[in-house]
Amino acid sequence: MKRPVDFFAMKENGEKITMITAYDYPSAKNVEQAEADMILVGDSLGMVVLGYDSTVPVTIDDMIHHTKAVKRGATDTFIVTDMPFMTYHGSVNETIQNARKIIQESGAHAVKLEGAGEVVNKIARLTEAGAPVVAHLGLTPQSVGLTGSYKVRAKSAQEAQELMDNALAVEAAGAIAIVLEAIPRQLAEKVSKALSIPTIGIGAGLETDGQVLVYHDIIGYGISRRAKFVKAYADIDETIEPALASYVKEVKAETFPEVKHSFTMAEEDLKGLYGRE
């Protein structure tokens, strides 16, 4: 299993880092078999697998539950787990206790926090406490309630400078990597070159040190609309939906199960059932 020191070396050597967001045992197993470098258990599970309208309702217990499943499916892959909405905006002690709970109970190797500002100090204190932290800048989904959209961030010179300053701040605080989401590729390149820690892009162009996409987006599973930055490598919904429809049709028509899908018993045993001939 790769560790933070390995990710630093990959950046140094120009080897791209691959991260895939997964939420359960079978998807994590697939990701590990594909030899991805990292798995992110994102609070996006709230929308992707729990059916919420946003990530806001996701709880620490949700994150622990799904991370434990991912851990069972990917026993030899570095796992990063999101700290959900408002679990790191209270006191430093509350933040440390929430991170401790996630790491100890789920087996995650690191936690991810969105934003900068007061979050920078939380990253520093978690790092001091021995908890590896991945930062997340640009489009931060937990803040969509304030920003009102999932549009690209940091397009103006002022916003770009602010993001650069924040990236340097979270690096100085001890973050082991930074996710850069939905920012101009030119800015992502400058940030990546300015930092000594890896940048993982999603909608941030080719020049970041690595890339992350959601498992479901990659394979086309349960997706009604794809973001511009998502490339579909498969569309398994096109296989799943007719398969399920065929099952329903065959059960209604009494053509499933066939004999080959059933078990039998010896006729003499059947005749002797409850002493009846």
Swiss-Prot record:
Positions that bind Mg(2+): 43, 82, 114
GO molecular function: 3-methyl-2-oxobutanoate hydroxymethyltransferase activity; magnesium ion binding
Binding site for 3-methyl-2-oxobutanoate: 43-44, 82, 112
Protein name, per record: 3-methyl-2-oxobutanoate hydroxymethyltransferase
NCBIfam families: panB (TIGR00222), PRK00311.1 (NF001452)
Homology family: Belongs to the PanB family.
Entry cofactors: Mg(2+)
SUPFAM superfamilies: Phosphoenolpyruvate/pyruvate domain
Species name: Listeria monocytogenes serovar 1/2a (strain ATCC BAA-679 / EGD-e)
Enzyme Commission number(s) from the entry: 2.1.2.11
Catalytic activity annotation: 3-methyl-2-oxobutanoate + (6R)-5,10-methylene-5,6,7,8-tetrahydrofolate + H2O = 2-dehydropantoate + (6S)-5,6,7,8-tetrahydrofolate
